[in-house]
Amino acid sequence: MILSITLDRKNGGIANSLISYSKALDLIDEKHFIILPSDAVVKNDLLNLPNVQIFSLKKSSLYFHLLTRFIFKQKYKSLIQDSKWIFIHNSKLIKFLNQYSFKLGMINHSGKLRNTLHRATNIFITQTGYERFISRHSESESTNIVIPHGFEKLPAVSSLKKNKVLKVISAGRFVTKKGFHDLVKAAEYLQKDNFPAQIELFGSGPLEAKLRKKINDLSLKNIRLIGWTENLHDEFRKADVFCIPSLEEPFGLIIGEAMMNGLPVITTKTDGAIEIFGADPEKKGGIYIDFSSPDQIKNAIQVICNDEKRYLLAKNAQDNIHTNFSLEILSRKLRDLFENEA
């Protein structure tokens, strides 16, 4: 039995990784028990998976029981003691579970290095994050490994969509680091060029009002802000290209999700993008742009309008995910982790 513990309640990278880890563990016949806050939005999705069992508490109660080492929750304490391996998804949890360092893996979702000095295993999701840690903490007592995320295989791209207007999709939390102001600016440039593209931006967040105001002030007709959708996969299947102009992105689960749905990707050179696309992005389904460069976003969208170019990038994107970032690969890496630490 494998145990995961998280304090996170929102949609996003941690929620998605709990799902992908559960599916990967199922491929190697491992049960996945998960301790999380009772109001975590991912709970219902996890309950639909055959190998998952949920143990939920109010977040404040979960903090209390972690602090008291679950002395008042013997069932939870037994879960921790009896588990083959424990994954934690928030770095602040490490101090509560140090005694289990021999079977404890902290998944470094953010790429930041806080709380990474310990005797447990640091699991980095990008090679860049791993190398950053090693360069700063070469004498660390922790075990340090790289396990990228994994994605389900979907039917191969067989033909181009027949959209009369190039449909560009983007998604994420409306915060500064996602770079969506640059996407709005690129929409302005495209509209001035009378270029036939429509940008749909899914998400929400503190910058939503500012983004809407900017779109209205510029009288832009080629970009729409849309709230979160329960099935982004359906939206990917309708689109022609995915654009993510982030200023930082530790892995970019959403990049992989777009690619497995057959979308070429326009992206900045974040840690996650470099992990996925490497030094020759077009062969792996992507086009790099510089940070804070709306003119380059515009140019990349115009380049991708070419049908032959777009189809080749779409095929390369899906092949890249199938070959390098599948659930099967993730499951093998997890099995190796458990066996090597046994």
Language-model features, listed with the residues they occupy:
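Nucleotide-activated donor-binding/catalytic signature segment of Leloir-type glycosyltransferases, i.e.
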Residues: 212-227
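A short, well-ordered alpha-helix in the C-terminal region of glycosyltransferases
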Residues: 309-324, 330-336
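Short hydrophobic beta-strand element within catalytic cores of glycosyltransferases
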Residues: 264-267, 278
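Conserved acidic donor-binding segment of nucleotide-sugar-dependent glycosyltransferases
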Residues: 279-294, 303-308
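Donor nucleotide-sugar binding/catalytic pocket of nucleotide-sugar-dependent glycosyltransferases
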Residues: 106, 119-156
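A conserved mid-protein helix/loop that constitutes part of the nucleotide-sugar donor-binding site
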Residues: 12-23, 166, 170-189, 199, ...
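Aromatic "clamp/platform" in nucleotide-sugar-dependent glycosyltransferases that forms part
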Residues: 228, 247
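N-terminal strand-loop element at the rim of the active site
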Residues: 4-66, 144, 205
